[in-house]
């Protein structure tokens, strides 16, 4: 089935196309419309013309974490099938601020923030994508030239009633929480990106489904063949509760040091581990099922967690780094102090323990420091600190918070 206005003929669905479709569907939440996408794949195979696969990311923060790589991994799989990947940096839409999943207006970024964040975005994404097979675009290329006249014409193509079909907008409207007019523009501008790029498929998280469908509708209005849409699940953070987010502190950045990345991955629950295998591992589903069977048969879950952590560390660093990270983790687990801990010099002795931990960079706040003390997670030279009112005298010592955070502190008066 095809929605192309020129009604192109159907192409045969071969075993090769079925395989490509199976690769595409691995781990996805939804592929709309599957029959249309199968025809796009078949046409591409018959004509030798690659599909145009679009992924837009707003540079709202300078770092990419593992949650972002769920959709990047899918892009790489499609790239390996021979299709053109368009890595779209939303430098224009970042000025608006994506309201998806928000219960309040998202503050737009400044041009300076956007440019600073965008500099490192693709360099990190290229750790997943094939740099040579990736087309990099900025949506300011076609959005800025629209001007007021073009923006008004674009806005006329969608109604407020349709916008209020979005769950987050509906909840805010019913709850009396303000919705700014500029927030309605975001889905329209993202949809217009698909028109400008003539996309065959657009990828996004499940929270992006409405925006992706707007792109499909706008393409129809502009006389283009409609894109299919593919949504990927949102990866849970290290806590296994909320989606991975830097602001929530439950993330693993792909630029983190190997030891830190490895340690964080080893901290996830045994249940969450299998979710990470499905969404982050490049192992086949059959192999993952076999490993899971071994776990259910009594093998220690730690063995599989080590496999996962090593695979991910090796992907973003090297196999040698992954091996060293495992050695470091085992050393710490036995109570040892890592060799590469930071050295910090502080003044003000005697210094309150909460302030010492914060100033040493081991915790973000004194309240977090006190919480760790309550839980027995703070040690000085191997001795557990239990007194939240402790004043630390001048000297040199190793301070530890939790299993992974260390600092060699020199405290002076």
Curated annotation (Swiss-Prot):
Its main location: cytoplasm. Pfam families: S4, tRNA-synt_1b. GO terms for biological process: tyrosyl-tRNA aminoacylation. GO terms for molecular function: ATP binding; RNA binding; tyrosine-tRNA ligase activity. Its EC number is 6.1.1.1. A motif ('KMSKS' region) lies at residues 243-247. Keywords: Aminoacyl-tRNA synthetase, ATP-binding, Cytoplasm, Ligase, Nucleotide-binding, Protein biosynthesis, RNA-binding. A motif ('HIGH' region) lies at residues 59-68. ATP binds at residue 246. It is an enzyme of class 6 (ligase). Residues 351-411 form the S4 RNA-binding domain. It catalyses: tRNA(Tyr) + L-tyrosine + ATP = L-tyrosyl-tRNA(Tyr) + AMP + diphosphate + H(+). PROSITE patterns: AA_TRNA_LIGASE_I (PS00178), S4 (PS50889). One of its GO terms (cellular component) is cytosol. It is found in: Cytoplasm. Homodimer. HAMAP family: Tyr_tRNA_synth_type2. Catalyzes the attachment of tyrosine to tRNA(Tyr) in a two-step reaction: tyrosine is first activated by ATP to form Tyr-AMP and then transferred to the acceptor end of tRNA(Tyr). Belongs to the class-I aminoacyl-tRNA synthetase family. TyrS type 2 subfamily. This is Tyrosine--tRNA ligase. It comes from Burkholderia thailandensis (strain ATCC 700388 / DSM 13276 / CCUG 48851 / CIP 106301 / E264). The gene is tyrS.
């Amino acid at each position: 089935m095809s929605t192309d206005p020129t009604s192109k003929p159907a192409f045969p669905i071969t075993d090769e196309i079925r395989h490509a479709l199976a690769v595409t569907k691995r781990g996805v939440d939804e592929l709309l419309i599957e029959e249309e996408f199968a025809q796009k794949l078949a046409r591409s195979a018959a004509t030798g013309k690659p599909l145009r696969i679009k992924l837009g990311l707003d540079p709202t923060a300078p770092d990419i974490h593992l949650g972002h790589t769920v959709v990047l991994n899918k892009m790489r799989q499609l790239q390996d099938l021979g299709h053109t990947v368009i890595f779209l940096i939303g430098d224009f839409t970042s000025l608006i601020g994506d309201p998806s999943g928000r219960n309040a207006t998202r503050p737009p970024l400044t041009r300076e923030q956007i440019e600073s964040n965008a500099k490192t975005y693709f360099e990190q994404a290229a750790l997943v994508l094939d740099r040579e097979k990736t087309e990099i675009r900025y949506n300011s290329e076609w959005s800025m030239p629209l001007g007021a006249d073009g923006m008004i014409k674009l806005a006329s193509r969608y109604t407020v009633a349709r916008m209020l079909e979005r769950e987050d907008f509906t909840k805010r409207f019913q709850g009396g929480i303000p919705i700014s007019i500029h927030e309605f523009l975001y889905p329209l501008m993202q949809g217009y990106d698909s028109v400008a790029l003539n996309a065959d498929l657009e990828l996004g998280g499940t929270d992006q489904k409405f925006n992706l469908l707007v792109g499909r509708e706008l393409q129809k209005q502009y006389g283009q063949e409609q894109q299919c849409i593919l949504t990927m699940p949102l990866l849970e953070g290290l806590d296994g509760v909320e989606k991975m987010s830097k602001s929530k502190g439950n993330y693993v950045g792909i630029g983190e040091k190997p030891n830190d990345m490895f340690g964080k991955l080893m901290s996830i629950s045994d249940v969450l581990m299998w979710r990470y295998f499905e969404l982050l591992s490049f192992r086949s589903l059959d192999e993952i099922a076999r490993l899971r069977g071994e776990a259910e048969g009594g093998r220690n879950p730690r063995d599989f967690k080590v496999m996962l952590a090593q695979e991910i560390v090796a992907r973003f660093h090297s196999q040698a780094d992954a091996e060293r990270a495992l050695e470091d983790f085992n050393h710490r687990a036995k109570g040892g102090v890592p060799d590469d801990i930071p050295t910090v010099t502080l003044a003000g002795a005697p210094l309150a323990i909460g302030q010492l931990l914060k100033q040493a960079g081991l915790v973000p706040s004194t309240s977090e420091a006190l919480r760790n003390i309550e839980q027995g997670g703070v040690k000085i030279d191997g001795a557990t600190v239990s007194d939240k009112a402790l004043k630390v005298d001048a000297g040199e010592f190793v301070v530890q918070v939790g299993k992974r955070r260390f600092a060699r502190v020199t405290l002076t008066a």
